[in-house]
Amino acid sequence: MFYGSSSASMSLPSKNRLKRQSRTFTQVLYRTLSYRDRRSVTDLPEQVRDDPAELSTQSSAPGVLKIFGDEISAGANYKSVLATPRSSAQELIKEALERYSLNKTSACNFVLCDVIGRFEGPDRRWRTECLRALGNNEKPLLLQDLWKPKEGFSRRFELRRRAEVEELAAKEKDTVTADINAQARKLQRNRAKGTMTLQHGSSFCRSLSETSLNLVGLPGEEPKRYYSTLPGPIRTRSARDSEIRKERDGGGVKHSLYQSPHLLLLQGYNQQDCLVYLLNREQHTVGQETASARPNICLSSPDVLPLHCRIRRAAQRRSSSDQRLLLEPVAHGNVLVNFMRIERPTPIRHGDLLSFGAHYIFLYKDPLSAKPLPAQTLTRLRTLAKLCDGESGGLPEKGDACRMCGAVLHEPAASSRRSSKAPARGSQKRKLALEFERAHEDALVNRVLTLIEPSGDDHKLTPAYLLCLCIKHSANTFPPGSFGKLLQKIAKRIQTIAWEKTKELAQKQAQHQDPASLSLLSISDLVPDLQFIFFWMSNAIEILYFIQQKSPAYMQTIELMDDKAGSKESLLSATISANEEAMTILEEVIMYTFQQCVYYITKTLYVVLPGLLDCNPFGTEPSSEQCRRAAGVCVCAVCVMPEAVRRVVSVFQTTSDLLQQYQVHSEIQSQMFAYLFFFTNVSLFNQLIDKGPARGWFQRSRVLQIQASVKILLDWAKGAGHNHLAQKFFAKFCSTVTILASPPQQLSQMSWKALCAEHPSLKPVQLHRILTQYQLMAELGPLPIWQPSSEDEAYIYRTVDLLESFENHPPIVLPSAGFKVDLESDCVEDSIYRQLLYVRHFVWGLRTKTHPSNGCTDRQDAQREPPQPHSSPHPAPSVRGEGEGEVRSSSTTLGGRGEGAGAEDRTRDKPTHGIHYRNGSGARYANQSQATDSSCILTPPNTPLYPEHTYIQSNTAHYPEHASQEHTHTHSHTKTNGCMRSTPEHKKINGFISNGIEGPLSGCGFPFPVPVSHLGPKSDDICSVFVVDLDKGPYGLGMGLIDGLHTPLNSPGIYIRTLIPDGPAAADGRLCIGDRILAVNGTSLIGADYQSAVDLIRLGGGRLRFLVAKSDLEVSEKISASSC
């Protein structure tokens, strides 16, 4: 008999129908077969017997699976479903639910169980011996063929509720096996490490978690790392972790920490706590192990409940590929996320700190996110380490953070000291200037707009400064009216970037439209995207003001020019139109970004504001007590607030931090908080009036709680400097709460006219509704004194005015003063000037591509016309602007000298000063007093300016490669520019250099490193080619590079131009000025230009490996004599 595969649309035929089909099929065979065959067919059901060990299947009815459902439907024995060996447990659950008249969509709440048991007693009652829940993808029929029950036992498949199965699993406890294995592991560890070393000061009567943060040895003693997830010499923990993981995962599959989310224990309760807990299941239970409960994550602290919380995977949306984990606390379970108590399912993110009870603190890590820990998490970890070490026992020190929320504690004295020191550091009077050619305008604008990462540490107004310098140079240098086109380019590019960022944010937040997802939305989810929007809003405001102030002066050049055939009028008109269009676009960008920020911030307020009306600030919350106890004297006002109020204030505080971090204009900051306060006031007032009677908010006890919560909110606004805005926009809600909180004896003495005068923000219909509800709650009779006046009586029936409208929000007004971008200022912050030097390098790179220096033409000319011998190369022109200041170190002058406009016409050939040799090996260092251009030094741009280092972004372009040859090619080796070079017969083997240096030659000769025999009699310890590993320091590598084409060497190659004393490169001791960099991290630099080489070093990571070739004295002198 043949049955098709099971599907959701098939239903099981009745027994009579099955018998008819079987009888018909048998009769057909009976008519067509011989008598012997007829007898075998008819006798087949009698010969095949059912297996008594398998109760869910029958040999006489293959393809039919009996699923027993006593646990979900009382009185129901079993239901039959069609199944094949390929049918999965999940599909069979759906079919069985349909047979049991249950909804198939709830299949996730049920599980198919493989149950082993037997019948006992005269009434043959089923007794379960073993139960195992099948996975969704397991195949019951295949499982049945591979594993058979023990003799005397039978198997059947049961449908049970998932929660009941998990509860049964939690009650099981195996203490014997755990104790035996624990003792074996202990003996194994003792044998592996020999004599056990006790921690200094430890006591046998004290129980301390091995994974706590305060395991610090004696001063000067190397810390003992007992257990760690990082590679190291101690390996005893790995065996224990693997065994624990094998026990918890069934011993079948090993899960890597780099593949699964996990909890890393930061602070535990005793030494039996595990260091890592993998979160590789659909759901994990956290709790204390008892006789009746055995959770997945067992914690031994006495304040942890048997079922403390759950960690489960959230339902994955089709539009999202990532899987989020939800932390679900149970009733009376103390669970904190980032030191904030939660009472509802909360999504946890990579880097969150989870606290269970009063002792356990975990770090949640998700390796799949491939992101570093957030900065706020690192701040919390540093603060937690100080807390565990007991270093901060009193008032918080400068730069400390709140131990509850991780926020940086601002000290007024420290801020004043920083502000007083700022002018002293910027007193170098560096004048800002940026020169470029008109042909490079588009490339320069695009580079400036992508230069700064909004989430980085650079000055947030750097794009505004650099773009205003571009506008200034265009207006003063290029033909009249050229700056108008530049304004349009800048405005349109900023508009495009702002729209793209807001569009990305809208697409991300589209998934939070349903109420369930919207309830999980928090302000921290929006911060990464809001950073971009605040960044460009702030820069657009500064650029708009610069255009408004400087455009009239720039247009005067057009008015003063000679009028030729009416060209002046048309040019002036076109420039004015372009100027107005650019300002209009920037105004739209400011308005649009402001509206988008307000929209998403109010969206988070919409989620947290209802809790403010239900909050009881007079109750004691464990999180607040823990904060006060941990901080001693906590100056962070947010962490001691009640939970509901803290959520609202967190939105305001995060917004304030973003506005200040991105240096948004102070007037725009005030306007944004005016709108947020307006939204909060209207939302709270409308909910109180609309839902107050049903929710009991008009009861005086509840009103007093609301009044206390609002007072906390207003106190925060006052401390944040927004007191006048809060008093203005919270007037209506505060008036309502004040009336409802007044005692009946006092309020009944006030007339309607007096109430209207004292609370002018309330409309007559609103005041009438409030007094009516007050009468009902206070059980007061009619009060004639509250009767509306004749002029107000007509308005009390206008219910359209009862609730406030969100359309009457405060307007957005662009500021007119108080801007920060000032190009004429003599004191400029180091970060801005550092980026300016970087952009000057970028412009210099564009110039060298367009106009090759040093007498070099393009590649074709170089190949077509070989350079003449004894030719004198021309020096590279200067690219330093007028008034460029000096950059000083303690003993090294690295800044460029201020030069006039004629500096570009001067030669730069300079003799080498102060070159000396060490041990006769040819190690050379430039004199510390030698003046060099600071823009030549290779160091990340976000480092301090003492000494100043900059680098060039990748802008790949290969320079012409040619060699100035002073001798013929008849020799086996020729010496060019002081370096030994092989002839074509010796320099290439299978496309690679024959002396072992990897990398294609691109068909061009290049200076080879000097062999050992040519370095002198005392150079036995020097190799011609060697490998150097350097770690980037706080100021980068401390090494400046230069392309040999732009030196008197006149040959391509990347050479060391500068070594900063005490830098990583100089500290290595092997690198010298003039040495050539052949490769970086295995990537050849032969044939690469300067910008590509610097970009490769920049993106190479914190540790770089260089292949370096030694150069002789002649090459070093030419490199040293060059100017950057």
UniProtKB/Swiss-Prot annotation:
Annotated GO MF terms: GTPase binding
Domain FHA: 284-342
Source species, domain of life: Eukaryota
PROSITE patterns listed in its UniProt record: DILUTE, PDZ, RA
Compositionally biased spans, kind Pro residues: 866-876
Residue intervals of the PDZ domain: 1027-1112
A single cellular component GO annotation: microtubule
Swiss-Prot/TrEMBL keywords: Cell adhesion, Developmental protein
Keyword NAD: no
Database matches in SMART domains: DIL, PDZ, RA
Annotated GO biological process: neural crest cell migration; signal transduction; substrate adhesion-dependent cell spreading
Tissue: Ubiquitously expressed and enriched in the anterior part of the embryos.
Record's subunit section: Interacts with RAP1A; in a GTP-dependent manner.
UniProt similarity note: Belongs to the RADIL family.
Function: Downstream effector of Rap required for cell adhesion and migration of neural crest precursors during development.
Any further remark recorded for this protein: Knockdown results in multiple defects in neural crest-derived lineages such as cartilage, pigment cells, and enteric neurons.
Protein name per Swiss-Prot or TrEMBL: Ras-associating and dilute domain-containing protein
